Amino acid sequence: MFTVLILEDDTEQQKAITKILEEHYNKWILYTAATYKEACNLIETKNFDLFLLDIELNTAYIDDLDCDGLDFGKYIRSIKKYTYAPIVYLTALPDRIFFALQELHCSSYLVKPYTAYKLIETLDYIYR
């Protein structure tokens, strides 16, 4: 089975992404996290094929860790089995994408607000 980790602190965004993926990729297994800490706990217990990461996480939900989606991307890349795993960043801050592309070698990114069509198109491109 194809397994996806969605790191998104906005619950409405998280639900929307999950709904889109469930409708278009109904055999995928989806896990969601709202914080860096939750995402770290999941990555330690599950195996993932794809990561969808919000760059800017609400610091009120970070559990005393001053970390964001870019930090989680660095953590992913530090794990040998995820060296080349696809990462798609979701952001309202396109100026931070350069780091994700250059340093973390993310597969793609989407600038918020994006459409369901654009999300599906991006994922289809990665996995065609």
Question: What positions do the PLM features span?
Answer:
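Acidic di-acidic motifs
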Residues: 8-9, 92
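Short amphipathic alpha-helix used as the core "switch/output" element in two-component signaling
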Residues: 62-83
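Hydrophobic/aromatic residues positioned on beta-strands within the core alpha/beta folds
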Residues: 88-90
